[in-house]
């Protein structure tokens, strides 16, 4: 499971505000309290029942606005998410964001469900039981569906075949980012016009 869900914490501890980024996707779910998230130059105030979605290498900072600030913090491997949900638009909130994307989603009436999902994720993460990865995938899928229902505009519309090919290229880049890659080389590898990649 730790290849998909690389870290999961439930916390009420305060942390100093500092700008940072991760090599992984990040989900922060606010259970109680309020915090200000600054992500890619946009400020959001997240209260109880808000889910904050942050992509790899997306610079952000967090400052608690009210106590207790209780939250769940999960980091997720984007390549593993892609493997877990290979044909799903649900992971688009971390990859292919439409214009007007909002990092902070209020789950509104689904807060009790979201609380329960994160409580179960924490138990699965800590217990290392057989089938833990499959359970984590199912719970993450539920959370992303709740997010979709609360804010469908955050998810890209259906993709054309050429856009699907670009998605494959994007996944390849994410998995091979330490290697030297060129647009021309990628276009040849995936039999696609270089203009689709620029």
Q: Which positions does each model-derived feature cover?
A:
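A hydrophobic/aromatic-rich effector-binding and dimerization subdomain
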Residues: 1-11, 59-126, 144-153
């Amino acid at each position: 499971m730790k290849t998909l869900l690389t870290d999961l914490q439930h916390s009420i501890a305060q942390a100093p505000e500092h700008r940072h980024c991760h090599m992984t996707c990040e989900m922060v779910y606010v259970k109680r309290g309020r915090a200000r998230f600054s992500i890619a130059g946009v400020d959001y105030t997240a209260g109880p029942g808000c889910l904050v979605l942050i992509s790899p290498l997306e610079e952000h900072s967090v400052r608690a606005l009210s106590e207790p600030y209780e939250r769940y913090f999960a980091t997720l491997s984007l390549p593993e998410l892609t493997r877990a949900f290979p044909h799903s638009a649900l992971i688009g909130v971390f990859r292919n964001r439409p214009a007007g994307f909002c990092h902070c989603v209020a789950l509104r009436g689904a807060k009790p469900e979201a609380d329960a999902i994160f409580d179960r994720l924490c138990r699965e993460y800590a217990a290392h039981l057989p089938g833990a990865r499959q359970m984590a995938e199912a719970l993450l899928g539920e959370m992303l569906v709740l997010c979709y229902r609360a804010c469908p505009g955050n998810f890209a519309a259906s993709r054309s075949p050429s856009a699907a090919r670009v998605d494959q290229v994007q996944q390849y880049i994410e998995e091979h980012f330490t290697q030297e890659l060129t647009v021309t080389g990628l276009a040849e590898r995936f039999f696609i016009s270089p203009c689709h990649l620029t």
